[in-house]
């Protein structure tokens, strides 16, 4: 699943832990947990070739990148400047 963490503008990947009375509790791939309304979650739709933003080297700087590989929580991306990185889905987001 993808969830809008804290009602923000970006979608972050995670898994559903529970569903109750119009809410969904999601555990994000970075380990955070949150309970959201059903409108704040959507099916996971990331695929190779899709553009996302990733936290380059985990330093807190987010850059646009294209997905080059996906395997569970592992993701390969190439940034707009040509830099490549293998990272975790928990360090990426989509808009």
Locate each region found by the language model:
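Eukaryotic chromatin- and chromosome-associated nuclear factors
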Residues: 1-95
